[in-house]
Structures are given as C-alpha cells and as structure tokens.
Amino acid sequence: MSMVDTAPGKIQVRDLNFYYGKFHALKNINLDIAKNQVTAFIGPSGCGKSTLLRTFNKMYSLYPEQRAEGEIILDGENILTQAQDIALLRAKVGMVFQKPTPFPMSIYDNIAFGVRLFEKLSRADMDERVQWALTKAALWNETKDKLHQSGYSLSGGQQQRLCIARGIAIRPEVLLLDEPCSALDPISTGRIEELITELKQDYTVVIVTHNMQQAARCSDHTAFMYLGELIEFSDTDALFTRPAKKQTEDYITGRYG
C-alpha cells in the first residue's frame, strides 16, 4: 500500500478494520484523503470500497451487527468514538447514493429540507440558499421556473443533480458519492463528471466507481481495493500509467475483477 504525499489529509484513516458480524470486510486500512481534491475508490464488486466510503459518515451505525475499529480523523477528531454526534457528522459529511433518491416533495423543499434541520433561515435567505445549491449543481436554469413541481418530475440525470444540490445545501465539508452515475445515460454521466470536477473548489470529494475511465477523468487520487485490503493509493495519473503493484496493473488492464 502506498500513501499519497499530502499532509495532513482532510480525512485521515488509521488502522481501520470493519466487520459485518463476524465477516472481516476492511483490513487495516491506512490512507489520507486530501482536502479540496477528488479521491476515487476503485476495485471489483465486494472489494470494500463502498463499505469504506460509508465509514466516513458512520452510515453503518444504523445496523447493530456492523462495527468499525481504528481511527478516522476528521478535523482533528476521531469520528468513530461513541461520543460523536451522528447528526452533526452527517451535516459535515454529505452523501449521494447510487440511484437518484429525491424526496417525495417539491424541488424547492428537497433542497430546503436538510437546511431546516440545522438552520433557521428567513424565507428570503432560504430562497437564496436554494438558488445557490441548484446553481452549484448546474440545475438552476432547468428548474427555476418549476421549483414547486415534484422532484420526481425531473429526468434521472436531473434527479441525481438534485440530490447533489440537496447534499451541498447544508454546506458540508466533505461530499461522498457512491456510484453516482451507474444508473444514468452517457450524457447525464458527462454532466455529473463535469460537476464533480467543479465541486472540489469548495468540497473534499470522495467517489466510489466501477468505471475506471471515470476515475481517470474525474479524480486527483485513486485507491485500488481488493478483498477488503487497500492495495495501492496514488496520484491518479501515476496509478493508471505506472502502477506500483502487479495486482493493480492486472485490474486496470482487465486481467481480473
């Protein structure tokens, strides 16, 4: 395993192990996620990349049989401790899932929903926040005249951008994207990829993808995982052109996975 030469990381993972019951899903993971960069996790199905992503906002805490051991340091604090406030963590670390998941409410309320949980804004300030989030997600021009229509009225690609807008509306520091383009057509995928590149100006972005070309296009750093282990972690260009490990080379050249 090699670590990217960035110090200190926005997220620092130290000796992380994760278990689904007795199944050891992540094994001694160590890496630093660089601030205001895009980091991609790649690897075959079941390698642990989505599991690792979900430890960053403790999504596993919903399931008592799942547990993490080790440290994940965010802004100097280990988020894996029992003292960690889950709601505040998820305000700081936003997440967008594989399939678009708009709430059953208007486009406007999809954006405003999370904001209302953490802030008391005037109507004018909320209007401004909704416009800001939709603009950041490259969706404002397509929705500004139909904000009170259902989020379900949007196309699949628009719904995913709505979910990204919803995620950034509460102004997190980190944005997690779990296969955000897997259910989208190539045109919508292209727009999401452009958006990911733009978002790193304001956020630390971590993306899980099966699409190695997507990782190569969008990310600054890439981690290759296999069977719960971090095999290699490097600058994206270096990992794809000069992999240090044979397992990495075999995967990116299609020899297995």
Curated annotation (Swiss-Prot):
It is found in: Cell inner membrane. SUPFAM superfamilies: P-loop containing nucleoside triphosphate hydrolases. Its EC number is 7.3.2.1. Residues 11-252 form the ABC transporter domain. It catalyses: phosphate(out) + ATP + H2O = ADP + 2 phosphate(in) + H(+). It comes from the Bacteria. Keywords: ATP-binding, Cell inner membrane, Cell membrane, Membrane, Nucleotide-binding, Phosphate transport, Translocase, Transport. ATP binds at G43, P44, S45, G46, C47, G48, K49, S50. Gene3D superfamilies: P-loop containing nucleotide triphosphate hydrolases. One of its GO terms (cellular component) is plasma membrane. It holds the Pfam family ABC_tran. It is a peripheral membrane protein. GO terms for molecular function: ATP binding; ATP hydrolysis activity; ATPase-coupled phosphate ion transmembrane transporter activity. Belongs to the ABC transporter superfamily. Phosphate importer (TC 3.A.1.7) family. The complex is composed of two ATP-binding proteins (PstB), two transmembrane proteins (PstC and PstA) and a solute-binding protein (PstS). Part of the ABC transporter complex PstSACB involved in phosphate import. Responsible for energy coupling to the transport system. This is Phosphate import ATP-binding protein PstB. It comes from Enterobacter cloacae. The lineage of its organism: Bacteria, Pseudomonadati, Pseudomonadota, Gammaproteobacteria, Enterobacterales. The gene is pstB.
